[in-house]
Amino acid sequence: MANGPWLRLYTEILDNPKIQLLSDTNFRWWVNIICLAKLRDGLLPPVKEMAWRLRQSERDTSRALESLTAAGLLDVTDKGLKPHDWGAHQ
């Protein structure tokens, strides 16, 4: 875990349409996902591990990842999924 057991959450999300247009459920997914990303230097774990850590089904986890990727909040990289602009924000 890089730089301690915390992550940055910027007040700018109040005016970010990508964030503010999320459903309450997807906002919760997004917050939990960025917490998981922090534990792995920005990269998300495999779906099976994410589902277990978040106490969700693999199906619901996959759907949430698809939704957040479509919203522009997750990027597909050659190493896996990563929150958009992770390096700039963390």
Over which residues does each language-model region extend?
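Detector for short helical micro-motifs
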Residues: 1-90
